[in-house]
Amino acid sequence: MKKNKPLCVEVFRGSVVENRHFIDVCVCDAEGKVVFAYGDYEETIFPRSAIKPFQTIPLISILNKKNVSQYLKGEEIAIITGSHNGEKKHIETVRKLLEKYQINENLLCCGAHWSLNPSVAEKQMLDIKIPTNMMSNCSGKHAGMLILSKFLGAPLGNYLEQTHVVQQRILGTCELFLGKSIPNANISTDGCGAPTFAGPLGNWARAYALLADTKYLPDEIAKASLALISSVAKNPFYVAGSSRLCSVLNSHFKGDIFGKSGAEGCYGCSFKNLGLGLTLKCRDGSKLGAEVALGYILKE
């Protein structure tokens, strides 16, 4: 086991430490060489929504192959990759995306919830009685899966089944970026109902490094990866939204650093100029712990 001390984020109330969050961190290059780490980088984790770039890449890749990539706008790629707030622009973008490809929004199987942003959620609750699937932070991702189903000539109604060609494409892409196969024991269901995949923390860091240093990827996957990073850098609002770290980070670094959060204290980053990737996981699932740890690492 590759272990050392995890990063520790202390939360104070006055002069007293009220809580401690322990975070495993790995930074490595595109060949998987570890540059530095805190904690156990061999720990198997579900990156949660930090997996979304690798769920988006198969769609961009097939559109490139079919020479229709120009029909997927930058903000559309960003929202497919994102975990959005369900703000007006987010919902409008997902709706127009589905309309463009003549897909009924009732086919979305992402579930419904109020916005991840409390102030946005409060406004939503005043406007409507119950949330809709379009408001789900994952509606963009699910729209992307439906579009991919359509271009593969696959049925749309069961696009979330693990054996569906869309999910098999995504599985293959994740295995490519991880550099290893994913056993059935490491496949489960994410909060939005989509299959999700677990792997060692260090391998997810390698996956993010490959987004920064694409020369080790097949040409079509490298091209799709570059398009994804560029789209998020130019349209950071659509990857998260108002008062969200993902949007702030991607807006500030303009593609030099790409970042994507995941539930239960996960975060992934790629560093374009360094050709490195980072993945971190807060052991107790704290979003606060993960974001403070990320800020510390970026500062260092």
List PLM regions with ranges.
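Beta-lactamase-like hydrolase cores
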Residues: M1-E42
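Active-site-adjacent helix/loop patches that line small-molecule binding or acyl-intermediate pockets
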Residues: M1-K2, L72-N184, C192
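Short Gly/Pro-enriched turn/cap motifs at secondary-structure boundaries
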Residues: G14-V17, M135, D256-K260
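Short glycine-rich loop/turn motifs
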Residues: R20-V25, A143, L171, E264-Y267
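Short acidic-glycine loop/turn motifs at beta-strand connectors
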Residues: C28-E31, I62, F271-L274
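Active-site SXXK
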Residues: P47-K65
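Bacterial peptidoglycan biogenesis and beta-lactam-recognition machinery
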Residues: I60-Q70, Q102-N106, G153-N158, V165-L171, ...
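Structured C-terminal helix/loop/strand segments within mature extracytoplasmic catalytic/sensor domains
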Residues: A209-E300
